[in-house]
Amino acid sequence: MAHKKGTGSTRNGRDSNSKRLGVKAYGGEKVTAGSILIRQRGTSFLPGINVGKGKDDTLFALKEGTVSFESIKRNLRNRKRVNVVI
């Protein structure tokens, strides 16, 4: 017989660090070349004029300018395109 009650264990207690995804530069903001505009998983936002796409789908400015967003219809799914206007 146990003198004290044994404590159970749980299979919880883990949580991943947040990945800080989302829009980093909004429409109308001035950005420099190389600035990160959007961090994303997949292509919710598509690269437009003067915008490049990294291997993790991050969008970044190729030239200095002002950020602008436009809505496009593609494959029955509304997407947004990000441009950097000089």
From Swiss-Prot:
Annotated segments matching region Disordered: 1-24
Pfam families associated with the record: Ribosomal_L27
GO cellular component, one term: cytosolic large ribosomal subunit
Biological process annotations from GO: translation
GO molecular function, one term: structural constituent of ribosome
Top-level lineage group: Bacteria
InterPro entries recorded: Ribosomal_bL27, Ribosomal_bL27_CS
Assigned keywords, A-Z: Ribonucleoprotein, Ribosomal protein
Family of the protein in this entry: Belongs to the bacterial ribosomal protein bL27 family.
HAMAP family per the UniProt record, alphabetical: Ribosomal_bL27 (MF_00539)
Name assigned to this protein: Large ribosomal subunit protein bL27
